Each structure stands twice: as structure tokens, then as C-alpha cells.
């Protein structure tokens, strides 16, 4: 992965390259950022720059034997660790390595939900157990194939079981010479504090709307500039979310959410039952996408209600919705509506019954929007 292929983050790229050229390479670095920010492709680009045999001032050469191997994620000094569905027979990453390589080469902005779908483990927990930590130790005991750095990239280390995390900590405390750990995380709160203290933080921010809109138009040539910007604003810098909305018709999601809230406000129980049936048919990923989008809209409504319209980021039909729905917000219900949607999103992630959950949420919103 070349830095030039990573969307945005110009100043961060320059800092990473500058550190390398000045010989300031921390043995453990935590690429921390929200979903869809590009922390995985950034870490891969940094790994390629570390291992490149003919580094340029702004990027790896892309042509040397090392670069050609990394382009396929097959460099012998680049070790890849990631969460898997653990079974009695499969406890390490190796059996899934070709699948993960293919997934990342197809989409370097891969997220945990899409990885879970690829493994067909929708209702199962992806983890990294102690055997994977031992796998890390084994790989680091090998000599560098090309005599340079050995790079250990750990994707989503927050999904390590406690015993595995403790073993990783010991490796970080006593690193092998010439070893660089690249930890790629979306939730540092779940990492051991001692691991955080051993790693240099590389903070990766969400993509800027202009950067994201440009990337969307490059991927979807049929998108107008206005539509691309609308998706960029709605996804709040999350490329994965923006592309999911582009693939699944964000207008349909908006209409579903708007009309459902209208039914809740009017206390139209039969209509909300119909919406619950429709919600159940969406599938788990689109159900989660609906709640994420709904949370975005509610945040915009809250900003409008708080009389800071200059911070509101909506266009088109959403503007009318925000102006109207914000009039229903009060000190009593504004935070509660957001909390209910966040809770519902979490329950869907944990495989709650979609129809039961949606009806329960509908009744709760009825009470918040029009208390008796």
C-alpha cells in the first residue's frame, strides 16, 4: 500500500515519513482512529515504507522486490495478526491468512462487520486468544528475511482475550531488535492501559468531508458533487459508512427513518408494526446502518434545537426534517432519544430479535415524543 493511495491525512503521512527518515521509529505504534478513517491503510503504507529498498522522499518506490511483495501482503518480514472465529481446531490466524489478505487487498478500509460477514460468522464473536499471542512470539523469533525491519501488524488488538493481551504486553516490554509493532485499533478504551503506555500514539482523525466526497466520486462516477458531499456529511468522515449508504440508497434509509418517527409521534401502533416488519427484513448490517444514520440525524436536530444552526450539516430533504423535528425536542427528551437509539444499535450488534427490539423502541419513542 502506497501513501499516495491512502485518502487524505497529508500532514500525518508527512510526519510518519519524516520520523522514519530521521531514524525515529518507535518499536510499538498505535494507529488509533474511528471506523472508516483509514488507519489500516495508513499502517500498511507505513509498513511498506519501512521495508522499501529504495525509499523516496514522499513514498515507497512501489517497484523494488519488497514493495512488490507487500503489494500482495506476502512480504516475509510483514506479519499479519487479526481476530478470527476461534474453534477447537482453529486457534491461530494462519488458516484465515489468505482470506484476510484478499479482503484487505479488495478493500483496505475493511471493518470488523464486513470481515465477520466474509467468515460467515454473523452470530459469533471474533477474538484473538492466547494461541494467537503465542503465534506472535513464534513469528518474532524468526530472523529478518531481508535483514531489515520485522513488522508485526495487529489489526483490532482490542479484541484480544485478557491472557493474550498480557502476553502481547510482555513482548512489547521486551521487543526483539529491529521489530516494529503496528497496532491498528478503533477502540482504545478496550485495550490494556499498560499496552497503551508502551505504544506511541498515532492519532488518525475521521476524513474531512471534501476528502471523502472526492473519494466517493472516484469510486462512484455517477455520483454528482452534491450527492457525494451529502454522503460525506451524513457518514461523518466514515468511508465505510458512506460507501454502504451509496450502495444501499441513502434516500430509502432517510424516508424509512422519517416516516417511522412520524408514526411514533402520532402513536400509530399498526403503522409501527408494519415498520417493525420492514426493519426485520433489512438484515443486520442495514439495521445497524439505519440506527447509525438515525443517530446522525438526531444529532443534527439537537444542534438545531440548541440554536447553533451554523453547526448543522444537512442538505436537501434532511434540512426540512431537521427544522421540523427539532421543534419536538425538549430538555426532557433530547438526550433520551439519542440514548434509546444507541442502546438499540448495541442490542442489534448482540443479535437481539429485530422485530421485538424495534417495537419496544417505537413504544419508548412514542412516550418521549408525546408524553401523556
Where are these regions (language model features)?
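Charged, glycine-rich active-site and insertion segments that engage polyanionic ligands
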Residues: 1-49, 55-58, 65-69, 177-180, ...
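Clamp-loader machinery-focused feature within the broader ASCE/P-loop NTPase space
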Residues: 2-163
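Conserved adenine-binding aromatic site and its adjacent loop/helix in ATP-hydrolyzing domains
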Residues: 138, 170, 197
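Conserved catalytic/switch belt of AAA+ P-loop NTPases
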Residues: 141, 166-180
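Structural recognition of the conserved hydrophobic beta-strand(s) that form the central parallel beta-sheet
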Residues: 151-155, 168, 179-185
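Conserved strand-to-helix beginnings and helix N-cap segments that scaffold or border functional pockets
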Residues: 162-166, 288
Amino acid at each position: 500500500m502506497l501513501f499516495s493511495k491512502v485518502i487524505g491525512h497529508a500532514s500525518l503521512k508527512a510526519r510518519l515519513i519524516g520520523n522514519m527518515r530521521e531514524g525515529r521509529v518507535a518499536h510499538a505504534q498505535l494507529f488509533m482512529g474511528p471506523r472508516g478513517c483509514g488507519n489500516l491503510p495508513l499502517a500498511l503504507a507505513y509498513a511498506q515504507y519501512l521495508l522499501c529498498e529504495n525509499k523516496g522522499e514522499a513514498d515507497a518506490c512501489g517497484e523494488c522486490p519488497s514493495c512488490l511483495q507487500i503489494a500482495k501482503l506476502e512480504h516475509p518480514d510483514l506479519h499479519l495478526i487479526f481476530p478470527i472465529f476461534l474453534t477447537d481446531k482453529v486457534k491461530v490466524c494462519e488458516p484465515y491468512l489468505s482470506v484476510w489478505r484478499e479482503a484487505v487487498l479488495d478493500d483496505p478500509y475493511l471493518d470488523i462487520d464486513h470481515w465477520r460477514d466474509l467468515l460467515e460468522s454473523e452470530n459469533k464473536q471474533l477474538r484473538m486468544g492466547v494461541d494467537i499471542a503465542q503465534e506472535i512470539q513464534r513469528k518474532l523469533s524468526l530472523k529478518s528475511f531481508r535483514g531489515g525491519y520485522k513488522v508485526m501488524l495487529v489489526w483490532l488488538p482490542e479484541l484480544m482475550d485478557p491472557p493474550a493481551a498480557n502476553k502481547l504486553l510482555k513482548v512489547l516490554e521486551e521487543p526483539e531488535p529491529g521489530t516494529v509493532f503496528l497496532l491498528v485499533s478503533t477502540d482504545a478504551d478496550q485495550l490494556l492501559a499498560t499496552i497503551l503506555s508502551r505504544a506511541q500514539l498515532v492519532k488518525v482523525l475521521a476524513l474531512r468531508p471534501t476528502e471523502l466526497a472526492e473519494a466517493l466520486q472516484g469510486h462512484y462516477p455517477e455520483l454528482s458533487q452534491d450527492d457525494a458531499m451529502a454522503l460525506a456529511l451524513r457518514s461523518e468522515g466514515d468511508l465505510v459508512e458512506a460507501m454502504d449508504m451509496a450502495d444501499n440508497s441513502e434516500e430509502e434509509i432517510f424516508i424509512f427513518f422519517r416516516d417511522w418517527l412520524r408514526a411514533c409521534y402520532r402513536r400509530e401502533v399498526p403503522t409501527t408494526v408494519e415498520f417493525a416488519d420492514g426493519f426485520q427484513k433489512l438484515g443486520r448490517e442495514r439495521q445497524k446502518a439505519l440506527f447509525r444514520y438515525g443517530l446522525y440525524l438526531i444529532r443534527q436536530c439537537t444542534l438545531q434545537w440548541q440554536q447553533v444552526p451554523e453547526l448543522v450539516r444537512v442538505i436537501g430533504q434532511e434540512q426540512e426534517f431537521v427544522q421540523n423535528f427539532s421543534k419536538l425536542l425538549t430538555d426532557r427528551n433530547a438526550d433520551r432519544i439519542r440514548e434509546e437509539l444507541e442502546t438499540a444499535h448495541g442490542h442489534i450488534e448482540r443479535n437481539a430479535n429485530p422485530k421485538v427490539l424495534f417495537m419496544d423502541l417505537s413504544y419508548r419513542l412514542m412516550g418521549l415524543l408525546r408524553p401523556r
